[in-house]
Structures are given as C-alpha cells and as structure tokens.
C-alpha cells in the first residue's frame, strides 16, 4: 500500500508540465462556464463537471489541483465564483438576488453566506465599501 501511495504521489511531480497544461485548460473552462451563461442553466459549477471536461476522474482531478495550487478544486472553483461575483457587484446595478441567480445559486441567502465567509462582508456591504 505504501508503494502504491508513493507511486501515486510521484506522478504529480514527474508530470508537472502536463499538470500545468491541465490547470490552464481548467482555468479556460472555468472562464467559459461563467461567460457562457451556464450557471443559470446548469447551476453552480462542480468538480465533477470540470473533471469530466478534462477526461479525468473527480478524485484524481481534485488531487492534481490540490498538488499544483495548494487549494482543493472546490476551493479553487469557489474562489473564481467570488471573483466573478465581485465583478458583477461592482460592474452592474443588478440586485444581489439577481447576481446570485445569474451565478447559479438557487437561494440568494446561500450566495450571501458564501460571499461573506470568503470576503468578510455581505455583497451589499462590499458594493457600499467600493462606492
């Protein structure tokens, strides 16, 4: 079992360039997901969704992202989500509820909770701070 674990871990080191390429593709897919309006039709992006696009298993994809970025794939996706949310909050006059729905949230309260946990203030508070 130890041998298997060492082999599994070593592949992340020996395939560093390939892994970087996968991360670049992941970032492109993530951008396309939000720019293409997919959140409204498909909901919040998932690790499985992007792993499928990369032709990798969700577990392997998650391990790869963690090794290369130091963040889990879910944290990485959520970071991008918050980044897009900040742009929407500052770049539009839409209500927080509209932004939440555009980003794929079923409930605006869930969006507000995640935003506040990540940024330290509510979306409305963030908008007020930037004005």
Question: Which ranges hold each PLM region?
Answer:
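An amphipathic alpha-helical interaction segment
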Residues: 1-31
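DNA-binding recognition helix and immediately preceding turn/loop
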Residues: 22-74, 92-101
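Helix-turn-helix DNA-binding motif, specifically the short coil turn and the N-cap/start of the second
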Residues: 57, 106-107
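Short hydrophobic/aromatic patch on the recognition helix
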Residues: 61, 110-111, 115
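Residues within the DNA-recognition helix of helix-turn-helix
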Residues: 64, 81, 114
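Terminal helix-turn-helix DNA-binding modules in bacterial transcription factors
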Residues: 68-106, 128-131
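…primarily DNA-binding HTH/wHTH and HhH modules…
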Residues: 113-131
């Amino acid at each position: 079992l130890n041998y298997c674990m060492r082999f599994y871990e070593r592949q992340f080191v020996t395939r560093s360039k390939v892994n970087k390429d996968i991360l670049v593709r992941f970032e492109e897919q993530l951008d396309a997901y939000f720019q293409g309006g997919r959140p409204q039709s498909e909901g919040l992006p998932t690790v499985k969704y992007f792993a499928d696009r990369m032709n990798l298993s969700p577990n392997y994809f998650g391990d790869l992202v963690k090794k290369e970025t130091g963040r889990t794939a879910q944290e990485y996706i959520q970071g991008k989500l918050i980044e897009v949310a900040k742009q929407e909050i500052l770049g539009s006059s839409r209500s927080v509820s509209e932004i939440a729905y555009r980003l794929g949230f079923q409930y605006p309260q869930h969006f507000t909770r995640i935003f506040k946990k990540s940024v330290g203030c509510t979306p409305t508070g963030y908008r007020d701070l930037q004005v």
